Amino acid sequence: MADEEKLPPGWEKRMSRSSDRVYYFNHITNASQWERPSGNSSSGGKNGQGEPARVRCSHLLVKHSQSRRPSSWRQEKITRTKEEALELINGYIQKIKSGEEDFESLASQFSDCSSAKARGDLGAFSRGQMQKPFEDASFALRTGEMSGPVFTDSGIHIILRTE
């Protein structure tokens, strides 16, 4: 139990049914990894709660027909289902994790957000500027860490914390 308490915020230890190995899952970012996460979710906190006042992230957004605005710079009317959007997101995550593609090139080609023109870079932001699930995931990530699928009213995101 003491081992669990030392995990960074949002992380929990789980057992893989397929490989019978322990892995770590972050319920805020939906990230999973075999290696035990170390340290705090951030360093140099400036807001008195052990987290930075601002973070910088890039993201790849896949919208679906239930998104709050089902259109993008890439497509006037988005008709894909939420399930199809999640399938695309999971495929992108696999390509990034395998090294087949890098985050920035996928974001610039396939993101439904206009930030695609900046390779997914959203710049720095503080709490209260983004939709809550996106914000929570962004602040829970460590610099250089990528989330799993993050669901917001805009669609499904992969978030990469860059600062």
Swiss-Prot record:
Enzyme class of the recorded protein, top EC level = isomerase
Which reactions is this enzyme annotated as catalysing? [protein]-peptidylproline (omega=180) = [protein]-peptidylproline (omega=0)
Report whether NAD shows up as a keyword of the record: no
- SMART domains per the UniProt record, alphabetical: WW
Cell compartment(s), UniProt? Nucleus; Nucleus speckle; Cytoplasm
Q: What's an example Gene Ontology biological process for this entry?
A: regulation of protein stability
- Tell me a Gene Ontology molecular-function term this record carries: peptidyl-prolyl cis-trans isomerase activity
Q: Where is this region: Disordered?
A: 33-54
- GO CC terms in record: cytoplasm; cytosol; nuclear speck; nucleus
Kindly provide the PTM information from the record: Phosphorylation at Ser-71 by DAPK1 results in inhibition of its catalytic activity, nuclear localization, and its ability to induce centrosome amplification, chromosome instability and cell transformation. Ser-71 is dephosphorylated upon IL33-stimulation of dendritic cells.
Tell me the superkingdom of the source. Answer: Eukaryota
The protein's UniProt keywords, in alphabetical order, are: Acetylation, Cell cycle, Cytoplasm, Isomerase, Nucleus, Phosphoprotein, Rotamase
Q: Positions modified as N6-acetyllysine?
A: K46
Q: Where are the Phosphoserine modifications?
A: S43, S71, S108
The residue ranges of the PpiC domain are 52-163
Q: Which Pfam families does the record cross-reference, listed alphabetically? A: Rotamase, WW
Ranges for domain WW come to 5-39
Entry EC no(s): 5.2.1.8
About its domains, the entry says: The WW domain is required for the interaction with STIL and KIF20B.
Q: How does it assemble?
A: Interacts with STIL. Interacts with KIF20B. Interacts with NEK6. Interacts (via WW domain) with PRKX. Interacts with BTK. Interacts (via PpiC domain) with DAPK1. Interacts with the phosphorylated form of RAF1. Interacts (via WW domain) with ATCAY; upon NGF stimulation. Interacts with PML (isoform PML-4). Interacts with BCL6. Interacts with FBXW7, disrupting FBXW7 dimerization and promoting FBXW7 autoubiquitination and degradation. Directly interacts with RBBP8/CtIP; this interaction depends upon RBBP8 phosphorylation.
Q: What does this protein do?
A: Peptidyl-prolyl cis/trans isomerase (PPIase) that binds to and isomerizes specific phosphorylated Ser/Thr-Pro (pSer/Thr-Pro) motifs. By inducing conformational changes in a subset of phosphorylated proteins, acts as a molecular switch in multiple cellular processes. Displays a preference for acidic residues located N-terminally to the proline bond to be isomerized. Regulates mitosis presumably by interacting with NIMA and attenuating its mitosis-promoting activity. Down-regulates kinase activity of BTK.
What protein am I looking at?
Peptidyl-prolyl cis-trans isomerase NIMA-interacting 1
- Organism from which the protein derives: Macaca fascicularis
